[in-house]
Amino acid sequence: MAKDIKFSADARSAMVRGVDILADTVFVTLGPKGRNVVLEKAFGSPLITNDGVTIAKEIELEDHFENMGAKLVSEVASKTNDIAGDGTTTATVLPQAIVREGLKNVTAGANPIGIRRGIETAVSAAVEELKEIAQPVSGKEAIAQVAAVSSRSEKVGEYISEAMERVGNDGVITIEESRGMETELEVVEGMQFDRGYLSQYMVTDNEKMVSELENPYILITDKKISNIQEILPLLEEVLKTNRPLLIIADDVDGEALPTLVLNKIRGTFNVVAVKAPGFGDRRKAMLEDIAILTGGTVVTEDLGLDLKDATMQVLGQSAKVTVDKDSTVIVEGAGDSSAIANRVAIIKSQMEATTSDFDREKLQERLAKLAGGVAVIKVGAATETELKEMKLRIEDALNATRAAVEEGIVSGGGTALVNVIEKVAALKLNGDEETGRNIVLRALEEPVRQIAYNAGYKGSVIIARLKQSEIGTGFNAANGEWVDMVTTGIIDPVKVTRSALQNAASVASLILTTEAVVANKPEPEAPTAPAMDPSMMGGF
């Protein structure tokens, strides 16, 4: 395919036009008085949203050079969303400001490499100052406040704080569509996995068709149990304790299953058998998780253990186990807390090392099950369009809340970025590096400027007063008042603000140092066939 190539100012100008189109579309959503954007969908009803990354992903421009600029900024929003889960609108406004100011200087003859170094130095100083002025987030009320700001709903804030309190900061919180109109919270405490009882005759509650084991022993193995003689010595030992037994195995079949069922029906022995969760290496890891949680040992050839030689020492224990036809929940495992903490640390390091989103998601699930449970926020709404929009907002709020707990919070509404201007301005730089620093100083004002503009106020006036105010005091664009931002609940997670600034500076610097752009030349359309002469149609 033939290529179209542009150089220097032509190349940068074309990309900047794309940056402007995307950023101008997204920035209308910024702040409490931000508007919505309607996105056409190929199928179904249009999507109405104010989520920056969702809008950015939908924008596709006809001009290839402009589209490249737009896609680079879209990448900033996506990257910020991946790292922090929120702040995507700010992440599109900032690169536009840096590119716009930088392009003026590059066009005037400044060295783009020097400017880039200045931008990087200034952003590093800004990030350090953000961390200095950050306040830690702890307690249910503070978490609810962060979530309420991001979702624009106090009720959603309460649900998220309740969920995080119940399942822990590392717990899995999923967002699903409700069948009703109300949004509700459902929490499954303990370790749950998707494997039910192997026989319905193992239930203890015939009405609910569940088996509930109080204070059971737990046998964990990756072997298939077909011969009851393999586990008979162990069963006799458990029988002496008069406590129930949960068997987690690759499978239980042959004579073993009917023998266990028969003893259960006769009341000799309360036992439930389930298949091991997962497959392959993931199954081994999950069985090890269960063993650590319950204080047991996986009976496996990898450790040189055999079922017929197993003793009571390999059995795990828990306060309660509930098994239905589809799932098993282990509550309050008797495992050593330091061993569990060590296992959690290992899984976290694996999450950081993996490049696969699927693997990261599965590791997160394992982490949650070890940490305490799973919470489900079921989103309800009157229409499908409202439901989609609400779901996006809650996802953003959940991510922002996790980010806030991780790195703390700063004043919201762009105030924190203005608060760090003094520290950045104090940097002693020369020449083009100083120009790069000044570009960042101007860009740090941009979110406040746009929030004020969307609310009908003059941005320059707001920024001038903000620079003279104490750190923490800011402008509430919702009602036009000057308030203590944190006390009022107008807050941003440091991780969100930091990620948006760092990613924006990175991509903007790349655009400013671009000297050539290569795009695919559109192929000429094939000529359409001429219409047939009616006289040649045989009189039809």
From Swiss-Prot:
Predominant localisation class: cytoplasm
Q: Where, per UniProt, does this protein localize?
A: Cytoplasm
What's the protein name?
Chaperonin GroEL
UniProt-listed PANTHER family: 60 KDA HEAT SHOCK PROTEIN, MITOCHONDRIAL (PTHR45633)
Which EC numbers does the record give? 5.6.1.7
Q: InterPro entries attached here?
A: Chaperonin_Cpn60_CS, Cpn60/GroEL, Cpn60/GroEL/TCP-1, GroEL-like_apical_dom_sf, GROEL-like_equatorial_sf, TCP-1-like_intermed_sf
Catalyzes what? ATP + H2O + a folded polypeptide = ADP + phosphate + an unfolded polypeptide
Keywords, alphabetical: ATP-binding, Chaperone, Cytoplasm, Isomerase, Nucleotide-binding
- Enumerate the Gene Ontology biological process terms: protein refolding
Give residues annotated as binding ATP.
Answer: T29, L30, G31, P32, D86, G87, T88, T89, T90, G413, N476, A477, A478, D492
Please give the superkingdom of this protein's source.
Bacteria
Tell me the classification of the organism that encodes this protein: Bacteria, Bacillati, Bacillota, Bacilli, Lactobacillales
Q: Which residues form the signal peptide?
A: none
Molecular function in Gene Ontology: ATP binding; ATP-dependent protein folding chaperone; isomerase activity; unfolded protein binding
Identify the GO cellular component terms for this protein: cytoplasm
Coiled-coil regions listed: none
Q: What does this protein do?
A: Together with its co-chaperonin GroES, plays an essential role in assisting protein folding. The GroEL-GroES system forms a nano-cage that allows encapsulation of the non-native substrate proteins and provides a physical environment optimized to promote and accelerate protein folding.
Q: Which family does it belong to?
A: Belongs to the chaperonin (HSP60) family.
Q: Which CDD domains does the entry mention?
A: GroEL
